[in-house]
Amino acid sequence: MAPTSVNKIAVELSLQTDLTGSAMASSGVEELLTNPWQGWCQRWLEYLADCLPPASSYELTLLFTGDRRIQELNRKFRHQDKPTDVLAFAALEGDFPLIESEETEEPLYLGDIVISLERADHQARERGHSAKLEVVWLTAHGLLHLLGWDHPDEASLTTMLSEQSHLLTLIGQNPPLFT
């Protein structure tokens, strides 16, 4: 449900790439980097403000990588030796503790979202939409994970995918259709 009034939320976004050993063409990556990620994340966090611990500002990292690197991370942290599309490493777990960062000028670090551009490109081709749309979709998914959302069963997955669709609509993107 959309909030009745939207408070401006300050967001610091660190946008990074690590495409060592990746087969991605640099032109596609450059196009992705020109997207207004900062504004999109800010808009999403403003909408999701009720899910955020209190802070004067927020910080997160968005890392674009390839299958090889994300497989290393997946093996190390999830014990699954295969590439995946998106990983989210939340800086805060579970119910957010009382945090004093609202009183400081330091941003509250939410965590890292890691996306395999190779996997996103493959999924986009399979699903018949653009790689850009797939990456935006995966970013929204990762952000929800940073804020404590999870999908251990079909019902929670359906709820989370619905929220992702709404996040894309908020930034003027048509959510992908899954058949």
Curated annotation (Swiss-Prot):
Coiled coil: none annotated. This is Endoribonuclease YbeY. Single strand-specific metallo-endoribonuclease involved in late-stage 70S ribosome quality control and in maturation of the 3' terminus of the 16S rRNA. The gene is ybeY. The keyword Disulfide bond does not apply. It is found in: Cytoplasm. Its cofactor is Zn(2+). Binds 1 zinc ion. Keywords: Cytoplasm, Endonuclease, Hydrolase, Metal-binding, Nuclease, Ribosome biogenesis, rRNA processing, Zinc. PROSITE patterns: UPF0054. GO terms for biological process: rRNA processing. InterPro entries: MetalPrtase_cat_dom_sf_prd, YbeY, YbeY_CS. One of its GO terms (cellular component) is cytoplasm. Belongs to the endoribonuclease YbeY family. Pfam families: YbeY. Its EC number is 3.1.-.-. GO terms for molecular function: metalloendopeptidase activity; RNA endonuclease activity; zinc ion binding. HAMAP family: Endoribonucl_YbeY. The keyword Signal does not apply. Zn(2+) binds at H141, H145, H151. It is an enzyme of class 3 (hydrolase).
